[in-house]
């Protein structure tokens, strides 16, 4: 799940327990047998209380974060990459699932790092697993929040080639927007910076060995990603529309009508079709703010419709049925073309 409430990896690491001397080992062993501690990997434990009282997605997030931290703590010469490093950068990753990937020196003797299954009582939180270790010449890297990670372009390239395609697309959209300091209010300069960022990512991708996994996916994702997507939801909708072969799509389309300036999330300007993603959790902190926000949005919609725009609204729940969203857009296209 993508959620701002997910803890940082730094916070998760601070909660982990390691046996640093003999008396501590005995105490930890007793706590593990009693269920007060759960073992993440050999020599790395998490207090069970850290998981109690949370929804399953957050429990999975904490366990996955603990595994990432365990890899960093156990293998000091390894460099986290892909979605793990994206978490540290603040990209909109799905925190409760996904591979744990790291680069290791070619001379590294150990290839595998196994993780224990995690249970609270009889409830399985996460099955046993292992890290994906890539032995290679280590990329240039940095220390961020105490973790060794590559620089942003390499992280984004690895996300683009190793993550599931829809997630890879969303991460690359967010990454290019970040590299370009994208602003809807300065679109010309922002688009130029975004194209330079895209060029840099493609160059980084081309520098990888030919045998690297996922390079074809990464090339497609980087070539089609759009910095104008302001949320993972918008990115997922755009990804589905592109796969459906729909042409002439823009993001953050600037529209002037009745003395107002509006930005449409995803648009087909030639047909005046507006696809608006409602990703907000709430509209305000008071009843008055909620009413004012809803009234402003309704007036915005009326003005766009008076200017000839057909508006298709999409909510988070619709992302489970993207085929229906695409079908709705295709119907709107046929209706507009056939007028």
Regions found by a protein language model. Give the residues of each.
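Surface segments flanking catalytic/ligand-binding clefts of nucleic-acid enzymes
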Residues: 1-11, 18-26, 183, 188-339
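Short gly/ser-rich loop at a beta-strand->alpha-helix junction or flexible surface loop bordering the NTP-binding
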Residues: 1-212, 339
